[in-house]
Amino acid sequence: MTPTGTLYTVSAPSGAGKTSLVSALIDTTSNIMVSVSHTTRAKRPGEQEGVNYHFVSHEQFATMVENNAFLEHAQVFTNFYGTSKQWVEDTLAKGIDVILEIDWQGAQQVRKLIPAAKSVFILPPSRECLRERLTGRGQDDESVIDARMAEAKSEISHYVEAQYLIVNDDFDTALTEFRSIVVANRLALEKQQDKHQSLLESLLS
């Protein structure tokens, strides 16, 4: 019998390295996928439909909300983002783990709907390092970086709501810790019982 997959919410302040860690974990670990969110924002250069996001209109998004199609959804400035409930449920049923890259508010919504979900929070090693990373992107001016630093403090204040905490100082160490969380959950009794049901029955017969 194939055990159901585990749902992970991964949250972090902007610049903590969440997306890079999730990408590296997906590339080096079998049977785990990252959920592709629906969004109303415009597609940026280099982004692909169904890879980075599912791009929809405000009207389409509103209809999906009315139809209860989202596991969680949120408004960020003038745009909306949401996680497809059906896709997550179907993927977990196949025994594949799913990662949701969402903020603390989204993680709260998910935990209410799926209490078995595991929450991971990623921290930068210091405020100075976080600012250096944001500055190093070369995407924003100082006023935007100041705003992101203020947002980071608010996001970090919710770390206590997570079950697992990773400090992304050394990337390889953080990745190993992240992978260890996934492996440990796969070795949990209820998962192993489902996976090795026939073996256990034969050993006890």
Swiss-Prot record:
Record-listed E.C. numbers: 2.7.4.8
GO-annotated molecular function: ATP binding; guanylate kinase activity
A Pfam family annotated for this UniProt entry: Guanylate_kin
SMART domains (alphabetical): GuKc (SM00072)
Record: residues binding ATP: A12, P13, S14, G15, A16, G17, K18, T19
Gene3D superfamilies tied to this protein: Guanylate Kinase phosphate binding domain (3.30.63.10), P-loop containing nucleotide triphosphate hydrolases (3.40.50.300)
UniProt subcellular location: Cytoplasm
Primary localization class, coarse: cytoplasm
Keyword annotations from UniProtKB, A to Z: ATP-binding, Cytoplasm, Kinase, Nucleotide-binding, Transferase
Reactions performed catalytically: GMP + ATP = GDP + ADP
Cellular component GO terms held in the UniProt record: cytosol
InterPro entries: GK/Ca_channel_bsu (IPR008145), Guanylate_kin-like_dom (IPR008144), Guanylate_kinase (IPR017665), Guanylate_kinase_CS (IPR020590), P-loop_NTPase (IPR027417)
Function per UniProt: Essential for recycling GMP and indirectly, cGMP.
HAMAP family associated with the record: Guanylate_kinase
Family, similarity comment: Belongs to the guanylate kinase family.
Protein name: Guanylate kinase
Record organism: Saccharophagus degradans (strain 2-40 / ATCC 43961 / DSM 17024)
Gene expressing this chain: gmk
